[in-house]
Amino acid sequence: LEILEAELEAARLLVYKSAWMMDNKMPNSKEASMGKAKAGRIGNRISLKCVEICSMQGFSEDHLLEKFSRDSKILDIFEGTQQIQQLIVARQVLNKSSADLK
C-alpha cells in the first residue's frame, strides 16, 4: 500500500504543478498530459488493488468499490487515452511537431 500511496502523491503533485503553471499563464501542456496520464493510471491501479484485497465483495454491486473500479477506468480514458498523453509528452520533450511523431 505504501507504493500506491507514493504513486498517488506523485500524481497529485503533477496535477498541482500543472494547475499552478496555468494560473501563472505558463505553457503547461506537457505537465497537464503527464498529470492526466499518471492520475488515470494510478487511480485505476488503486481501485483494482482494492477490489483484489476485498476479494468477492469487491465485485459485488452491493458495494461502492465495484462502481469505483468501473469509474476509474472511464476516468482513465476520459481526457484522452494513455497513448495520446504519452505522445503529447514525447512531442514536448523531443521538440517535435505532430507531423514528425505519429
Where are these regions (language model features)?
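Alpha-helical interface subdomain recognition
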Residues: 1-102
